[in-house]
Every structure is written in C-alpha cells, then in structure tokens.
Amino acid sequence: MNSEQEYYISLIDRLRQLPVETEWLEYKMNNYEPELIGEYISALSNSATICNKEKAYILWGVNDKTHEIEGTSFSPKKAKKGNEEIENWLAGGLKPRVDFRFIEVNTEKGKVVVMEIPAAVNTPTSFKGTEFIRVGSYKKKLKEYQEKERKLWLSFEQKPFELRVAMENVTASKVTELLD
C-alpha cells in the first residue's frame, strides 16, 4: 500500500469518527447522479469556507447512519453524463473552476471513493449558475439563506489568499518538483 492510500484510509477513519454528517462532509452509498454531485460540490465548497476548513468531502461507500464502511459500486473514472466523463462534465458546470479530486480507496471492508473539494476562495462556488450551501446536513440554495451568504462573504475577507494552504499531503520532493 502506498503512502497516499494510507493517508486516505486514515482520513476516512477520522471522518467516520465524527458523530454526524457536517456542513463540510457528506456520506453516500451508490448515489452518483451527476447533477446532485455538482450541487453538493457547490454546497460543500461554500460551507467549508464558512466552517474555516480547507476542504470538504463526499465519501461514497460509508453508511450515513452508522458510519460503517459498506463499499460502493461508484467508479468515477468510468462514470459519464451522456458521452462525457463525469469529472469533465462537473468541472464545466462549476464557477469558479474547482480543483476537486476523486480518490478510490480499497479498504478491508470495501471500496470507498473520497471526493476532496477545496473551500471556496474569494467568491461563492456555483453549479450551473446556482450557489448552494449546507444547512446542517441539508443542501439548500444560498440565496434562500441570507445570513449564511453574509457569513460566506465575511469569511472571504478574513483569510487572505496568501495564508491559505496550497496543497496537502505532499512530499518534500513533490514540493521541490512543483517549485521548479
């Protein structure tokens, strides 16, 4: 097992220890409807900013009630919307562009797909022209929650871009490579 897989297994275990889904964490089993994923990216990205988190996550293969790993049949590399790969299709609907990642992790109890979603920076993340937010564990339209929208804009002002984490879980050699 490589260090990236070990990191994500540890991350999955830490996230599963949280008592409930949060405004920056969503569990799914096999529901990978592209439209919903796009809306969740917007909601989780915006909520991560309000919650002062660098990233938000969707975990496929984890039961949202028990937090037990049950495995998923979702394979993001094979998933499509029409004839288009799901990653490309999702990226085209997000504004600003969001550098989300799908990571497939094989655990002892089954496959888990982790979607890492960066927190919104400088402007709310929208999907197909609509900005979403999490209210508890529910996805809602941001415009319907003016107090959340105000908090989101205040969050952009509180942490300058230069103080944000550029990348996580990167080896020293990778940092050197990226700087060259």
Model regions and ranges:
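Conserved N-terminal catalytic/coupling substructures associated with nucleotide/phosphate chemistry
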Residues: M1-D180
